[in-house]
Every structure is written in structure tokens, then in C-alpha cells.
Amino acid sequence: MNYLVMISFALLLVIGVESVRDGYFVEPDNCVVHCMPSSEMCDRGCKHNGATSGSCKAFSKGGNACWCKGLR
């Protein structure tokens, strides 16, 4: 049983664990990036920062803001 645990732990270290998250795209001063209803600017900005895609979230708490999916 101990060998199974040790082998599983070793595999996790060798394979590595990569996590992604969703969230708002922010400027250096930690303010959200506001957008128009067009999502093209958000998609480009999010992809530039390592996300898989981005869109404009209209009428959110912070106003119209860029939402990124799969940020690294």
C-alpha cells in the first residue's frame, strides 16, 4: 500500500499540475479593463495575458469589463 502512495506521489511530481482560472482582465493598477459590447478587444487582451479566450461582460458589478477564461 505504501508503494502505491509513493508511486502516485512520484507521478504527480513528474507529470506536474497545471491549473487555470477564470477572471477579470486588469490593468497594472488592479482596475478592470472596461470594454464596449464588442468582445474583440477583450479576446485579444486576454489571449495576450495567457488566457484561452475573453469576452465583454456587460452590466457586471464593475460595469462593462473584460472577462477571461483559462488564465494561467
From Swiss-Prot:
Propeptide: 72
Keyword Membrane found: no
Disulphide bonds in the chain: 35-56, 42-66, 46-68
PROSITE patterns: LCN_CSAB (PS51863)
Free-text tissue specificity from the UniProt record: Expressed by the venom gland.
SUPFAM superfamilies for the chain: Scorpion toxin-like
Swiss-Prot/TrEMBL GO biological process terms: defense response
Subcellular location, principal: secreted
Pfam families noted in UniProt: Toxin_3 (PF00537)
CDD domains: neurotoxins_LC_scorpion
One MF term in the entry's GO annotations: toxin activity
Segments passing through the bilayer: none
Keywords: Disulfide bond, Ion channel impairing toxin, Neurotoxin, Secreted, Signal, Toxin
Domain LCN-type CS-alpha/beta: 21-72
Location(s), subcellular: Secreted
One GO cellular component term noted in the UniProt record for this chain: extracellular region
Signal peptide: 1-19
Domain notes for this protein: Has the structural arrangement of an alpha-helix connected to antiparallel beta-sheets by disulfide bonds (CS-alpha/beta).
Recorded family membership: Belongs to the long (3 C-C) scorpion toxin superfamily.
Stated name of the protein: Probable neurotoxin pcD-993
Species this protein is from: Androctonus australis (Sahara scorpion)
